[in-house]
């Protein structure tokens, strides 16, 4: 993915199909709503690509995608960032994940993560650990490197790589992460509507 921008030969003049054409189709018929109680969530950070002096990413920087997936329902969340740190790991929970489950009347019980510096440390110094502790959420970090616990986040990220980001990069050639996030929110909302109708 490091050479994604070069490999795709993205040009601002290239015709851009509507993002709506790539959004998951939401079935209209009555179906059973998937269990969506936030009992067990999985969170993972992915490196997306490296950019240089583009848009609102100054200098030579990286783009990361923070993802969270509900184990039982498949409901997912994603945000793009220009850095990897504990504050961004907290931000996606505070701005996307917790408000969603609060609207559902659900309480998050536990979150599984890798045992990396973004997620693990000693409270009160570590923002992510402190946030989970004050929110009464149990943190379950991976016990050993390479443990394949995060397949849910991996599958969701691969779906974004295939269905969202190629189109989004063409649309946001100057790489405004703010504008890209707006489109990502719309895409993820449609994705979640499909998950809840399964």
Model-identified regions with their sequence ranges:
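Charged, gly/pro-enriched flexible loop segments at helix/strand junctions
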Residues: 171, 178-198
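Short small-residue beta-strand/loop micro-motif enriched in glycine and branched aliphatics
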Residues: 75-79, 140-142, 166-168
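Active-site beta-loop-alpha junctions of metal-dependent nucleic acid enzymes
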Residues: 61-62, 79-104
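Mobile genetic element proteins and their domesticated derivatives, centered on retroelements
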Residues: 1, 44, 68, 74, ...
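RNase H-like two-metal-ion nuclease catalytic core shared by retroviral integrases
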Residues: 113-115, 119-132, 138-165, 176-182
């Amino acid at each position: 993915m490091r050479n994604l921008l070069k490999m795709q030969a993205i040009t601002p003049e290239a015709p851009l199909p509507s993002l709506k054409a790539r959004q998951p189709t939401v079935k209209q018929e009555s179906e059973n709503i998937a269990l969506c109680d936030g009992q067990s969530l999985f969170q993972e950070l992915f490196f997306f690509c490296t950019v240089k002096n583009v848009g609102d990413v100054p200098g030579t920087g990286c783009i990361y995608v923070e993802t969270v997936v509900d184990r039982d329902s498949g409901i997912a969340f994603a945000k793009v960032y220009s850095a990897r740190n504990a504050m961004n790991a907290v931000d996606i929970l505070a701005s996307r994940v917790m408000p969603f489950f609060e609207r559902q009347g659900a309480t998050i019980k536990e979150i599984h993560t890798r045992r990396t510096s973004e997620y693990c440390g000693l409270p009160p110094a570590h923002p992510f650990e402190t946030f989970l502790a004050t929110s009464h959420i149990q943190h379950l970090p991976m016990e050993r490197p390479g443990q394949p616990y995060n397949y849910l986040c991996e599958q969701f990220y691969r779906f974004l790589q295939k269905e969202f980001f190629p189109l989004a990069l063409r649309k946001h050639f100057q790489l405004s992460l703010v504008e890209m996030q707006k489109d990502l929110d719309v895409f993820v909302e449609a994705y979640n509507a499909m998950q809840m109708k399964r």
